[in-house]
Amino acid sequence: MRLTVVGANGRMGRELITAIQRRKDVELCAVLVRKGSSFVDKDASILIGSDFLGVRITDDPESAFSNTEGILDFSQPQASVLYANYAAQKSLIHIIGTTGFSKTEEAQIADFAKYTTIVKSGNMSLGVNLLANLVKRAAKALDDDFDIEIYEMHHANKVDSPSGTALLLGQAAAEGRNIMLKNVSVNGRSGHTGKREKGTIGFACSRGGTVIGDHSITFAGENERIVLSHIAQERSIFANGALKAALWAKNHENGLYSMLDVLGLNE
């Protein structure tokens, strides 16, 4: 399967290029970077410190998408919406690992998915998506006598909060209790907040160092707690998940899917 990596000079872009080179069922077709990048016209090998790859880096989306079957996208929300538009026009598979979308941007991507196959997830790893499945089941089994609190930590350069993964876990918990996350979420607490409101889902976030991603969700009841957690040790888990999603999407109809669909975990 021929694939284009966008945002290729970022952390995940480089991981995706590396992951593609390790496999025989996918091929690096093109590499896209931001306009005016110093990497333009150089070989993609410069991004991962490998031998010559024979793929020229470009800042032109038309060129990057002209001979590809799919787009691997861990970029920025505005850019992802633009790429989703290209994907819809050219019937390209679009794998989106970008986080931090506004409600308007989410709606735009959902609209583009009517015309192509899009897999979008706040986390592409098998472990996190299995965790989300367990969280949903636990939330369904435990009533609101068990308070739900989600904690996440990421590297110092992460710009959105809570993380896409934390929101994915929160959404799973809300679905388990048949409630709307936006109506019950509490993002951080500071000062005199008063008593915790029953039925809410709390989020706490930390940023520092080079942490790839730590997530835990606590169900706190009377005299007992259930804690489910996931620790990401390498970004390669997200890259491998994205490739799995691309190959899966190749055989599925137009629509907006998640990694839960890819992994057969969506109930």
UniProtKB/Swiss-Prot annotation:
(S)-2,3,4,5-tetrahydrodipicolinate binds at H155, G164, T165. It catalyses: (S)-2,3,4,5-tetrahydrodipicolinate + NAD(+) + H2O = (2S,4S)-4-hydroxy-2,3,4,5-tetrahydrodipicolinate + NADH + H(+); (S)-2,3,4,5-tetrahydrodipicolinate + NADP(+) + H2O = (2S,4S)-4-hydroxy-2,3,4,5-tetrahydrodipicolinate + NADPH + H(+). NAD(+) binds at G7, A8, N9, G10, R11, M12, G97, T98, T99, S121, G122, N123, M124. CDD domains: DHDPR_N. GO terms for cellular component: cytosol. The keyword Kinase does not apply. Pathway: Amino-acid biosynthesis; L-lysine biosynthesis via DAP pathway; (S)-tetrahydrodipicolinate from L-aspartate: step 4/4. Its EC number is 1.17.1.8. Keywords: Amino-acid biosynthesis, Cytoplasm, Diaminopimelate biosynthesis, Lysine biosynthesis, NAD, NADP, Oxidoreductase. NADP(+) binds at R34. It comes from the Bacteria. GO terms for biological process: diaminopimelate biosynthetic process; lysine biosynthetic process via diaminopimelate. Its main location: cytoplasm. The active site is at H154 (proton donor/acceptor), K158 (proton donor). The keyword Hydrolase does not apply. It is found in: Cytoplasm. Belongs to the DapB family. PANTHER family: 4-HYDROXY-TETRAHYDRODIPICOLINATE REDUCTASE 1, CHLOROPLASTIC-RELATED, DIHYDRODIPICOLINATE REDUCTASE. This is 4-hydroxy-tetrahydrodipicolinate reductase. The lineage of its organism: Bacteria, Pseudomonadati, Pseudomonadota, Alphaproteobacteria, Hyphomicrobiales.
